[in-house]
Amino acid sequence: MLQILFGDPNERKIGRYKQIVNRINALEEEFKQLTDKELQNRTAIFISDISKNADLDNVLPSAFAVAREASFRVLGLRHFDVQLIGGMILHEGKIAEMKTGEGKTLVAILPAYLNALCGYGVHIVTVNDYLARRDAEWVGQVPKFLGLSVGLIQEGMTQEERKNNYSQDITYTTNSELGFDYLRDNMAILLQDIVQRPFYFCIIDEVDSILIDEARTPLIISGAGETTEEKYVQASKVSLNLVKNLHYEVDEKARNILLTDSGIVESEKQLECKDLYNVQNPWASYIFNALKAKELFIKDVHYIVKDSEVIIVDEFTGRIMQGRRWSDGLHQAIEAKENVPTQNETQTLASITYQNFFLLYPKLSGMTGTAKTEEAELDKIYALEVTCVPTHRPMQRKDYSDLIYKNQYAKWKSIADECLDMHTLGRPVLIGTTSVEKSELLSSLLKEYGVPHNLLNAKPENIKREAEIIAQAGRKGAVTIATNMAGRGTDILLGGNSNYMAKNALNILLKEVPSKSSFTKNDPQLQSLHSFLLNKIESYEIDDDELETKISIACEKGFTEDALTITLRAAYQILIEKYSSLIKKEQGEVIALGGLHVIGTERHESRRVDNQLRGRAGRQGDPGSSRFFLSLEDNLLRIFGGDKIVNLMETLRVEEDVPIESMLLNKSLESAQKKVEAYYYDARKQLFEYDEVLNYQRLAIYSERRRILESNNLRDWVIQYAETTIEDYIEHYFDKKHSMPNSASEVLDKIEDLLGLPYDLDPMYFETLSTSEAKNFLYQQVRIAYDLKESQIDLIENGLMRELERSFLLQKIDSAWKEHLQQMNSLRESIGWRGYGQKDPLIEYKNEAYDLFTSMTTNIRHSVVYLIFRSQPILKN
């Protein structure tokens, strides 16, 4: 009703942006007439205006018009009006929902250029190193042309390289590199070791993937912990002897294990221990993890085993997460289950969730093809509003209703039949699967059917060809199996992708012997190019790795002055022209057949991920279609669907190989997905609420560390620590003064011991003092003791006291914080049980976390004061 009265709020917002688009378009002819130099000079004019407090919103129309003209001159790409709208949404610190193929990468350049004019640095975040490098080298040429600097952060870079790249006006990086650099900066011992500048503006590509899907996985830097391999192995053996529903129950919704009374007794019997929960010799966590590994974590679904190592598979992208480990002993339990070497437990040194990390930016924005379904969460946790950007061309994709089968066998047979039909027609098909295991099941089925296909899953041998496989998934007759959203970031072009075909051809021409090459047979142009390239390479002394690097650079659009790379790029352009004409013909045939057909093999727990898969078809107004094939044995229906669906199938007496298309079933499916989304949203919200408590403490500790690093003289800092410690003692003394006759002697003994005073303090004199007099008297003793200690230390080396102050302060803060993180983790694990005592676990957690933090800060002060005042200089002969 409100929408009828007031109209669609999204359309009203777009209407406001269109007015600004008209202003940008009005400047287009003027900027077209400018020379390159004149266009580049506009950057200096904008910077000057902003330094005089010009509002960025007022600069926006001119800055966007300049960036659009520069993009056309440098890349040959002109921003469409809808891309200008996307840029405005990002500039305002919102999320722009833009469909697949609408040019998000190009859109990010507009707000990045505008905001970089302020001089504080803009971060553009992508999901992997490849995309970060591709975008920096390709669209990064636009701000470079306009006089701004562009940086790139990649895995394996040195500290100096990182520092240099973060200092640029616009920096491309990945979410994990950015987060880990933040944590490492807050563990730095020297100010010059810090690589990042203060945060200003961040644009996140695939924002839903990072802020929603990865929100439950904290970034953790850890150090070596205890070695308890035997316990994991023993617990794994015990778990094999425990019987499901007798000794333990599995809660698949919560992904948790509940041990029954008989399970506790049986475990204690097999382990020959009296109490699983004994604090001195705890076994409970080992048994729980062993059972989780047995029941909830499946090989080739949740992880793969490669070279005797358990590697996590990202449940949302299907990619392997090399170097990432499950925490709290779960990873070791899975290693024991798979009978591979169990790595040592680790102790957390620093951690942060993506939720709290990205909230550190004063201005945050993001782009994705699918955010509307998570709008409430993005607004509540990140205060990010989602605005849908209209497509440049009308959407033509047909989304067919789901086909639901009684069992898995009938479903997979039907999928294979559909693939065969499409392949026979010549229509390209992309099949999305939810795990490595299921992708390989379908692959073996298609082999039986004689259907040629490409397989893309988390297995390393497949992942190497990821971009190439996805890029060619739109060719006539192509059949591509991909786990989840593998290949996200690479467009599927109907008829194929001439760039990838040209790159592949260039690789073959450079590596095949002319006399043995079947590739160049009957093609004089390729034969001529083959001979020319091989003669050219012979004049350079270059190994295969170097050649591979030069081919990669030649096939990208970044600037290069290397002679061989320029030659390779020229050859690459010739090959692109050759394949473009071939593709144009094939593209017309594929369009006539109906475009790309996407098959979903299971509904994901999130509607958003289903929409991402569907979104691979019908890009930029192309035709396309999608259909999901489901079975009652699929996890979503089995765990969350309830008995309603099963009863309906039984009532209808449906044959196993006959699918059902039913509005009631579709509603039940959507209801099941909403239940799961609500469940995981609650889990992320709870994680956020608990981590927010730790986050306030983290910010306090990190800001204290930073002030210590930036301070040239920490004398007053240590004296303040000492005075606060003295205050604690005095307050305790005056509380106990009347009830404890010897309290003056006791408190003065402690203070003498703490400060290492070379003389005794008089208890009788002390008892005559008021509280303020006692404080002033002891503060005076602190300064006397400190002056004495400083003169002793500086006898060894002048200025040594200043170095000791910084070293002791950082050392104690870091060690105390490490212990505190462990205590907070233990508190978090145990606090849930308070709910059974009619107490709110979150309030209990906040109260106890505050007590732990207060205790930690007191401990830091006491330890630093003791270390400095009691340190004994050793003079060399």
UniProtKB/Swiss-Prot annotation:
Keywords, in A-Z order: ATP-binding, Chloroplast, Membrane, Nucleotide-binding, Plastid, Protein transport, Thylakoid, Translocase, Translocation, Transport
Cellular component per GO, a single term: chloroplast thylakoid membrane
GO molecular function: ATP binding; protein-exporting ATPase activity
Catalytic activity from the UniProt record: ATP + H2O + cellular proteinSide 1 = ADP + phosphate + cellular proteinSide 2
Residues binding ATP, per UniProt: 83, 101-105, 491
Annotated compartments: Plastid, Chloroplast stroma; Plastid, Chloroplast thylakoid membrane
Record GO biological process: intracellular protein transmembrane transport; protein import; protein targeting
InterPro entries: Helicase_ATP-bd, P-loop_NTPase, SecA, SecA_CS, SecA_DEAD, SecA_motor_DEAD, SecA_preprotein_X-link_dom, SecA_SF2_C
Annotated Pfam families: P-loop_SecA, SecA_DEAD, SecA_PP_bind, SecA_SW
Protein family per UniProt: Belongs to the SecA family.
Function: Has a central role in coupling the hydrolysis of ATP to the transfer of proteins across the thylakoid membrane.
PANTHER family: CHLOROPLAST PROTEIN-TRANSPORTING ATPASE, SECA INNER MEMBRANE COMPONENT OF SEC PROTEIN SECRETION SYSTEM
HAMAP family named among the record's database cross-references: SecA
Name of this chain's protein: Protein translocase subunit SecA
Lineage: Eukaryota, Cryptophyceae, Pyrenomonadales, Pyrenomonadaceae, Rhodomonas
Designated gene of the protein: secA
